[in-house]
């Protein structure tokens, strides 16, 4: 298993043009959010944090075209802010970030599974350098290529995405590094939304999130929250599966 650290600071490069959200905060804005979240036990619904605190956190979330990070996409095609009483039956997914001003929508349910069980030819471009891999937002293209591939090459992570809400006639895909890293960049807002609505899954530090991006034909990239709030990316050997199971998050093809 390999690792590539791209940044050593507590937040990612504030000038990044590929991911938005927490990483685009000024230091003053970041300090404000950090003060709000530093004492929260995200996995303990009975801790002292109040709903007002989570609402205050969400006020700092990035907004594009009247849609905010951590808003929910409803079955009727509208977006709504996190609020109590929101039913899972009415929700398609949650906004985890933006790319080219289009919202990246993630499923409420997370799955486990790795990209591959064996060595194979790559589905898309190979990224040997992590800094380049973080610029990849082609998960939709790669997933479509996989879907049209050979039946004997069925892999866990792709299948979880292709089969999610299959009866709804929606197109879900396995995210590339840029898309998955964008989601992890915004974990504070997503967790705050979860604590208000009780929908979805808490994003924890140390959890491994698989991507469809490959380092080469033998290794795939995954994302993990380490060192405070920023995600780093790592690679695992697909043949030996030393990593074990990764978390898979289906993302939705959605264009405004």
Q: Model-predicted segments: where are they?
A:
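An exposed tryptophan-centered "aromatic clamp" motif
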Residues: 2, 154-171, 177-244, 253-256
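Short, compositionally biased
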Residues: 2-168, 244-256
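Short, conserved beta-strand segments within well-ordered enzyme catalytic domains
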Residues: 105, 173-174
């Amino acid at each position: 298993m390999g690792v590539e650290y791209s940044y050593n600071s507590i937040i990612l490069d504030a000038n990044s043009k590929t991911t938005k959200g927490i990483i685009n905060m000024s230091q003053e804005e970041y300090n404000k959010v950090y003060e709000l979240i530093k004492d929260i036990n995200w996995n303990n619904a009975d801790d002292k944090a109040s709903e007002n605190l989570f609402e205050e956190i969400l006020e700092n979330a990035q907004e594009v075209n009247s849609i905010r990070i951590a808003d929910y996409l409803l079955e009727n095609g509208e977006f709504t802010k996190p609020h109590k009483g929101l039913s899972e039956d009415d929700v398609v997914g949650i906004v985890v970030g933006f790319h080219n001003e289009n919202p990246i929508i993630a499923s409420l349910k997370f799955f486990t599974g790795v990209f591959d069980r064996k060595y194979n030819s790559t589905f898309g471009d190979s990224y040997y350098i992590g800094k380049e891999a973080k610029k990849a937002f082609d998960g939709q293209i790669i997933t479509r290529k996989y879907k049209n591939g050979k039946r004997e090459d069925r892999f866990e992570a792709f299948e979880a995405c292709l089969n999610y809400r299959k009866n709804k006639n929606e197109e879900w895909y396995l995210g590339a590094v840029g898309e998955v890293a964008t989601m992890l960049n915004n974990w504070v807002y997503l967790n705050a939304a979860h604590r208000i609505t009780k929908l979805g899954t808490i994003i924890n530090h140390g959890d491994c999130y698989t991507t469809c991006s490959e380092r080469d034909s033998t290794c795939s990239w995954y994302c993990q929250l380490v060192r405070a709030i920023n995600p780093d990316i790592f690679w695992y050997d697909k043949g030996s599966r030393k990593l074990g199971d990764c978390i898979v998050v289906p993302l939705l093809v959605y264009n405004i």
